[in-house]
């Protein structure tokens, strides 16, 4: 059975669900999921899990993301991106480059961000975007996000008139809305702003260099096999043959060397455990003097792909970031 991650370069105009549907047909299985939604307008890295690799998606969702984007200052839209109608326009012609850099700096680091009202966040059981489209008022609470890097590459006034386009790179925590950053930069400068282009270049350790278009994947399904995917994603632990057998049956083994300090593996941030032949056996969490399996992937005696006793297996995950 084919299992692994596929790093897709999502095309513009496709929803993340559209991509999952296409991958189901290409992989010949319905057990396919993705690790973080990209808006239809956005392009770039969408991590897709196939079969057993869907178990890894939970641990990918929470990783940092990197984007390149273009922010248009001088116009606000209902969606905070180019897909929505312009609802306000204030000339940005007089906004100095220095002010733009200062505005970007103010939005860097640990910040409180109000997500875009046209988002998949639920309000009283209803998606925020559905409430907006039906004419209802939507007020979302601010939440903490981390903007690790917010870098201006180019300030373009060539379009003339009242708008200024700013090309940026953003590295951020999971759950950050780049549309909201564009909105907040414009609001901070007093002219409004929205996103006109967005491309995701990294999701955790996975990058555009590894990504393939859907057309390329239709010709050759390029799959990052389980052990490679896990080695890149989380701390590694090499098992002995005896430990491999124990873990394969869901039993605990001696804790790793890091047990008891901040580097220790946890249920939320486990270590990937590998057999002597390099294959992925399980995900482990340290608990006192022992390491216990969080998920078991090892072949043999029915252990393949099962959760460890007493532990619920994470399912296919999808998070919103764009």
Located regions from the model:
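Accessory RNA 3′-end/elbow-binding domains used by RNA modification enzymes
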Residues: 1-11, 17-34, 38, 42-43, ...
